């Protein structure tokens, strides 16, 4: 009986540690306009997991070069598929939808204390992503 209880307690702890901290929708139209991540700004703690949901077609979620903490692994989801990412390192992570990046479809994940905020702000952006990225990092 003790063994069963120990296994049950372990299962509960593991499922709690893998719980989602946030869910971000990839949308053609949202509260902030066309081609958006909603929400566009998420604040979490190291080790938390975010699910990027392909609510509408023709979207993906991938990291933006130059907008990752040092030593963090880049990620790139496939088109029209949900992406689940665990953010282990503290800092600012820029996220883009590759097909709609120039239209400003960007999001920001702030994990713990953002030591790389200045570097993230200085990262080159293109098209409408430039003001959108600036807005999310202020």
Predicted regions and their residues:
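Extracytoplasmic copper-binding redox domains, predominantly the cupredoxin/blue-copper superfamily
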Residues: 20-138
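Bacterial N-terminal signal peptides
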Residues: 8-16
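Bacterial N-terminal signal peptides that target proteins for export
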Residues: 1-7
